[in-house]
Amino acid sequence: DVYAARQTGFAMLASGSVQEVMDLSAVSHLTAIKSRVPFVNFFDGFRTSHEIQKIEELQMEDIKGLVDMDALQAFRDRALNSENPVTRGTAQNPDIYFQGREASNKFYDAVPDMVADYMDKISAITGRKYRPFDYYGAADAENIIIAMGSVTETIREVIDYENANGQKVGMIAVHLYRPFSAKYFMEAVPATVKRITVLDRTKEPGANGDPLYLDVRDIFYGQANAPVIVGGRYGMGSKDVTPSQIIAVYKNMERNEPKNQFTIGIEDDVPFRSLPAEADVKMTPAGTYEAKFYGLGSDGTVGANKNSIKIIGGATNKYCQAYFAYDSKKSGGFTASHLRFGDCPIRSTYLITTPDFVACHVPAYIHMYDVLKGLQKGGSFLLNSIWDEEETKKHLPNHMKRYLAENEINFYIINGTKIGQELGLGNRTNTIMQSAFFKITNVIPYEVAVSEMKHAIDKSYGKKGEAIVNMNYAAVDAGGKEGNLIKVTVPAEWKNLPDDEIKHDENRPEFIRNIVDVMNAQKGDDLPVSAFNGYEDGTFPAGTAKFEKRGIAVNVPEWQVENCIQCNQCAYVCPHAAIRPFLMSDEELAAAPAGTQAKPAIGKELAGYKFRIQVSPLDCTGCGNCADVCPAKTKALVMRPLESQMVEENRWEYMDKKVGYKKVVEPNNVKNSQFTQPLFEFSGACAGCGETPYIKLISQLFGERMMVANATGCSSIYGGSAPSTPYCTNYESGRGPAWANSLFEDNAEFGFGMAEGANRLRERVKRLAEENLNSFSADTQAAINAWIEAYEDGDKTLATSDAMAAALAKETAPAAKELLILKNYFTKKSQWIFGGDGWAYDIGYGGVDHVLASGKDVNILVVDTEVYSNTGGQSSKSTPAGAVAKFAASGKRVRKKDLGMMAMSYGYVYVAQVAMGANQAQYMKAIKEAEAYPGPSLIIAYAPCINHGLKASMGKSQQEEKKAVECGYWQLYRYNPMLEIEGKNPFQLDSKEPDYTKFREFLMG
């Protein structure tokens, strides 16, 4: 990404490790002041920015002595000030612009020497030597790599290994990338070099080479006896770069004709540009202990491991490193924590593949991932098991049993899930598992670890009250308690166990089998380039999320048929569409899996049907909102352990595929809407998400003709993270939402463009149909006239479009063929623009305002969490006054932006503010009115978020919406300009007089 800044005129300084970030950031700041040239001080996102390392800290007193105070004062004197007025930013014409730009050259020419000087001064303070281009390796190296960023640390490991085995290799780590100094570069290159490989972490399609490669090649251009120079790409999209990949790069240079413009880390079996993979070689320093932890997003595993590495680093003299890998799902997604500690500096900027210790915090993972892969012989494995010792043995797959026995693994179990629930911690098993880790490994005395963990608890949870602190104290004690932590006997005969028989579902689509299943097993790195033939533009098929069957819930709802009043509210509020009502005929009920219960459907239109609520246990996230909103006198939904509900999987398949979604009633109220197939299902959103129920209902009402532009944020991540696509198609028609994500800042314009493009093509259809009407038969003319009559009625055009297409297919006139080419535009599209408050109130507000002002028929849904949810809860302009959020730690000082009022000021924009949990019918009215309104509409939906830290948990998110409205924190209203045409007040306040006595209770969570 940083390559995009090359043309800005900023100097650019790279760091390759956490320690280098500490040291070289000072160089950037010091040089920027002295040189008058602005700097981009950069390092690898995630790999370096999110790595935890034990480093030596530069002290401000040391840096203070290096600041050029005269230059600093001159910098301040140049500030715009009315005491010494000047004019900057003038519009310059061609006569002088060029000269002005060239006049700045002297400042850039001076930068390399200044950088080198400050590097020398920092080196004198730290004892760590830095130059604009750092050479590392054999003094007489013949083959060298040139690279920048975190990969240079891995290359150093490989150089030590190769040179110890008789090779002569080296590396130049680029620090000062701009200005690119030939003087300092050549100073770093050994005179013995014969071959150079330049590694770039980018791809510039169509170029003769990538940026750093072209810079290096240019320096040697025209030199006699210049070395052979080749380039390669690596690590794109943060792909892990291992020592074996770097070994392959050095081996490539040993060939008579080294491959140029190659790739590493992937199998390129299409243009065949990848280098052959080399065998893995362990290069971490001897004595380095490696531990790997598999967890679930929001279960606290990552946070606990951050504490663990800090405890080890603080309590010992050991070097420490921690790195955390995530999938793209929200809470409930896959996480892997990689911890290293030892007596030597750790330069391994890649994931752990041969751990000494593995902990699996999620029982379901033993059937989903190869959690034991690479675990060292004699290592330890800790499983958070919901079963006792004997039941655990029954549930373990044979390949795991065999690995445990063959490699003499020390196997431990603890029921962290049960302990956590008993202590009141819910699904947060992190502290329990952290304590068990220290007890098993004894990397520091357990008593010291307990003391440090409790100190960390005081620091983390002290503000949340004594009760929370004590619960976590108890979790620490429980994790190492005898009787809780059990060492499992591993029978020797497990060595001879065959693999379990794997049942292959031949009905699974090829894309699912070949790509989705592989990625979901955390084996996406193994997919070759050829796997994406046909998907080169990044397009993914719709509806892949239903094949995941993650099974991440601890408890799922069980339907109590006798208590159900058939309101369908449970399905209405479900964030993941994992619970649905079905209508069955007597024959369908008779053919259902044995034991399927149902009851006569209530309602005149439903006479003769049997009613059933069906749960998909493996798709449910166990939030419990369905059970919470159930209004039955005795709850019709009771949360039960997932394992007890697995019998419902077959019933789900039968109800979903065989019984289907009967169009017996119009979806004109809350109950009836839920008999419609959701076309947004099983997303990667957090359990209890407040956003997704809003989107799900829109998909049920308008999904067959929906076009969606989605702003970057939570809704784009759970809406379209490869390989999971929750937007799906209607089983009968094959239609469904067409979804795309552009950027954060341009989503409103993007959606506006989608709508305009579709409308232009549809207008063309209408014009062609009208112009050629008389060339068609009477039946076709009737079909066309019916279509024209319903032109602006979206739902009616579904039927009239099919009828017109069928009639045109029988015609021979050339115009019929031309019209049929455009048949995908017969139906009136329902254009939706989705995004969060960070987009609508802040970064994309200009676009939102522009689109609303246009008067065009588009619908904007803002899922308002009042913070930037996707990035961890930072304050936005939607955050209300007094609220505590990131960047507003002492409470936001200004009031919330009234987006609805601003939109209403136009007078021709439909605006609604809604909260489903407070008034389900009001939300439904609002979206139906908004979609039917022949102009722009804006719906602002209150959405509780995991970042709010609700004390009652996200299982009460619908209740939280209700509280927000009842106490006056959030208002419900609709502003419909169509009413003004009828002489009525367009504004309707839908919420009651607030009960302000409930306001404090709401704020307290």
Spans of features found by a protein language model:
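Glycine-/acidic-rich phosphate or pyrophosphate-binding loops and their flanking alpha/beta elements
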Residues: 119-143, 156, 274-288, 545-547, ...
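Thiamine diphosphate
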Residues: 1-6, 10-34, 116-267, 273-377, 569, ...
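Structural signature of the thiamine diphosphate
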Residues: 12-74, 238-278, 471-493, 908-962
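Ferredoxin-type iron-sulfur electron-transfer modules and their immediate structural context
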Residues: 449, 453, 462-619, 627-831, ...
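Conserved thiamine diphosphate
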Residues: 1-45, 69, 218, 222-235, ...
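Conformationally flexible catalytic loops at phosphate/diphosphate-handling active centers
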Residues: 39-134, 495, 960-976
